[in-house]
């Protein structure tokens, strides 16, 4: 094992070319920590928000004029193998294949340290490292939106707006696993993909406006966030639930949070329930997701794979907003 490892860091906010692949000291592990040799990671919209410092709210968290130490790293998903464990670690041993994530980011690196009680569990044997690394953040978001916020039940009609992206591909599959009748909204090139994930109906938004079909849904998982709130409410049943997961980065100061704020204000005065949230990583939900993966009720969808040396290109591609499933980094 060498004394240095390669990792992605950045010292200023800006486009993908601010990212550097640097040599850093090997992470030290404490008595309750695990050293993981990262084999694959993935990128998420939150990565480019932090990279660019946009919306401005991000800078209040990460540093105003430039990212502070600890906030200048990217990547929240990973899969790899255990290299070493602290003396108090009983759950893992060297050689174990694991997957999970880091709340504080930093998985775009050759090695990371993780607490044994952190968001890390054994990798499903039926997945490659690349497939496993594509799962955590997107699957957590879809799971928590459907199960916790929408409280979806078997037989309900669920519409997923943005069905072909990272979160959307998991949302379609999980909604089906929960017994819902699922409609996915996507563009023409992705219709077959969304249908293959189990969607009962697919709406091609380039030829049909899903807000004007006259159909009503019990649950709308709005990942794209590309329609006016009044339009999305129109497709909900009178007591339906709209869960806002994301949306375009409109507004310099708080970006998509402005839409979330409008939902919070409006929800108490209408019969429909309008919910917005930010997903949180936790070990219990990772175990739930792992079971769905092992039983093949859910499968990861990977659009493109890039090496660690091409993270800038990967995030640039993700920023374009047309990824089919996840964008993965091999390490």
Model-derived segments and spans:
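C-terminal hydrophobic helical "lid"/dimerization subdomain
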Residues: 2-3, 280-331
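Glycine-rich beta-strand-centered segment in the early N-terminal region that forms part
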Residues: 25-42, 56-104, 223
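A structural motif shared across PLP-dependent enzymes of the aminotransferase-like
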Residues: 102-116
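Mid-domain Rossmann-like dinucleotide-binding core that forms the NAD(H)/NADP(H) cofactor-binding site
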Residues: 132-204
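A short acidic, Gly/Pro-enriched loop at the edge of an enzyme's catalytic core
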Residues: 211-219
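Glycine-rich phosphate-binding loop and adjacent beta-alpha segment
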Residues: 223, 227-298, 331
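Short glycine-centered segments of the SAM/dcSAM-binding site in methyltransferase folds
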Residues: 97, 157, 181, 240-241
């Amino acid at each position: 094992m060498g004394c240095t490892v390669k990792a992605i860091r950045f010292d200023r906010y800006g486009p993908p070319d601010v990212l550097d692949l640097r040599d850093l000291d090997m992470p030290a592990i404490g008595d309750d920590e695990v050293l993981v040799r990262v084999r694959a990671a993935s990128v998420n919209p939150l990565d480019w928000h932090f990279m660019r410092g946009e919306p401005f709210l991000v800078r209040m968290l990460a540093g105003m004029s430039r990212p502070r130490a600890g906030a200048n790293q990217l990547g929240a998903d990973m899969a790899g193998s255990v290299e070493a464990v602290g003396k108090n670690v009983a759950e893992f041993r060297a050689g174990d294949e694991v997957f999970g994530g880091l709340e504080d980011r930093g998985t775009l690196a050759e090695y990371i340290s993780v607490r044994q009680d952190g968001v890390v569990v054994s990798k499903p044997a039926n997945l490659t490292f690349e497939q496993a690394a594509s799962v955590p953040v997107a699957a957590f978001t879809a799971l928590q939106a459907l199960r916790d916020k929408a409280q979806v039940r078997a037989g309900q009609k669920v519409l997923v707006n943005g069905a072909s992206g990272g979160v959307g591909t998991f949302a379609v599959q999980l909604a089906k696993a929960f017994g819902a009748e699922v409609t996915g909204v996507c563009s023409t090139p992705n219709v077959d993909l969304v249908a293959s994930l189990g969607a009962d109906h697919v709406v091609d938004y380039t030829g049909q406006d899903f807000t004007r079909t006259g159909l009503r849904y019990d649950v709308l998982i709005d990942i794209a966030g590309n329609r006016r709130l009044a339009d999305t409410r129109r497709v909900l049943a009178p007591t339906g639930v709209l869960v806002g997961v994301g949306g375009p980065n409109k507004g310099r100061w708080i970006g998509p949070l402005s839409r979330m704020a409008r939902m919070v204000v409006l929800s108490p005065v209408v019969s429909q329930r309008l919910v917005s949230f930010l997903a949180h990583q936790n070990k219990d939900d990772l175990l739930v997701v792992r079971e769905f993966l092992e039983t093949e009720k859910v499968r990861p969808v990977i659009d493109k794979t890039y090496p660690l040396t091409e993270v800038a290109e990967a995030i640039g591609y993700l920023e374009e907003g047309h990824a089919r499933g996840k964008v993965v980094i091999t390490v």
